[in-house]
Amino acid sequence: MVREMIDDRGVQVQSPISILLAGDIVLDVEDADHWLSGIAPAVLAADVAIGHLEVPHTRRGSELAGDVPAPGAEPAHLDALARSGFDAVSLAGNHIADRGPEGIEDTIARLDALGIAHAGAGATLELARRPAVLQVGGRKIALLSYNCVGPEAAWATRNRAGCAYLKLVTSDGSPVSPTAPLLAPHTEALQVLHSDISAARKLADLVIVALHKGIVHTPARLADYEQPIAHAALEAGADIVVGHHAHIVRGIEIVRGKPVFHGLGNGCVVTRALSPGQDHPARAAWVERRKRLFGFEPDPAYTLAPFHPEAVNAMLGRVLWDDAGGLEAGVVPVHVEPPGRPVLATGTVAGRVKDYLERITAAGGLPPLKLTPRSDMLVVQ
């Protein structure tokens, strides 16, 4: 709820609108409320809360070739998102089409029934590129969502369901995929950003662009295209840019007063799809292959979130939007507990997350980051 205050002249004014931003969300394990409960207090406290829904929630469809397919999650698990306080989700990513058009249709239908706004996927490319618009305190926020990493089979077309996308140039000319050598934004991607953000600005006072981007399971490092495409979104008129996909957090930068969260990491990911004991051949092979490709060994205690050990350092992005349009960015530190439940971090654990974020921001080649503790968040200085 937007809060109202009285200034020293006796004039009623609104306090800043608080925007909470979460990374990848995968809820394909029962008792979704439990897995979200550790971060729910921060989500519920926000005026607007946005996450990234990684997989389709459906009992229908067949596997779509093009990437290692994620299983469809139970549609009823989305109800926990609403109960936890999420107002909107981005959908454009490498797994949203893993159960074909039926998976996208069922996911959107459930979100609509719950009153959760969404952007980034749809029955056609036009629908996938359409922004979600949220109204809060007399002001409007538009959310746009794009997949930067493929697979191309998941991209929506004029007559095929899928996700919105930003085309990248690959260094060897290969099709865009999560394992392709992605190099730079294609001219077409820049045109899409300019067109869509310009249109969104006519509908809303603030525009958030969500980019599914980055190198998975790799601490700190930004791929060559990540800063250019994030900055292109800002230049096209976006106010906030958020990234996800890597399943580990990335650095933060402020560009002309506008925050870029290059990787929010895992908002809440609990899945058995990455268990060595599961019986899906392609997923079982990926469980081992990713360890060789990215040089890590998951902590065996994290049976439902077997990611890079550094992924236990997590965060929620938080932005305060004042009456004059100014933005104050920060993070809510999060720690992931075994077997994969994220919880709000406090005390020394929060301090470790703070130090980690400052360190990986520098290691990623971004300007130095200083996070200053405050009661409601770590403020980006």
Located regions from the model:
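Acidic, metal/ion-coordinating pockets
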Residues: 1-381
